[in-house]
Amino acid sequence: PLIRETLSIGIPTLIVTFVSFATTSVQSSCSLSVNPNGASITYYARIWYILPYSVFAIPITTAMFTELSSFVASGKIGKFIDGIADGCGQILFLLIPFAMYLIAFSPCLSNMLKSARMSSEDVQMLSTYIAWLSVSLPFYGVCTYLQKACSSLRKMSLFAIAECIAGAIQIVICLV
């Protein structure tokens, strides 16, 4: 029974990882078709994008995962739902202002990361990409939190299905 439970969490998580790899690969390939430095632009933008998530959202999701798991284990589903709402609120409270900071300071941030190989046009494109990517930062934080919530429920199959659908949509959008 324990192996079955472990596999019921592990296999969908592995599927989510493969889908994420595929979408990232397609996005990188598409960025190269737009601009020869497209991969560098997306890489540098992701550095700034992930920084506030890593510093602020990951500690919240890690701490809340423990609480959510204990609520599920003790059968307190009402507290589990409250925990999801509280965690989402905390993540949004922190990541919405940082998304705005990234949007406002994207020109400065892109100038800090420019290399000798990037033209001023590429730096401008990096700035624009950081600004537009930042709009999704709060949603990304909540999505990764919901992944941990599904994991604490020990029901990752629903999340894996949602990730497969979202990944397919992203790939189609990139290829069209």
Language-model regions, residue ranges each:
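Membrane-embedded alpha-helical bundles of multi-pass transporters/translocases
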Residues: 1-176
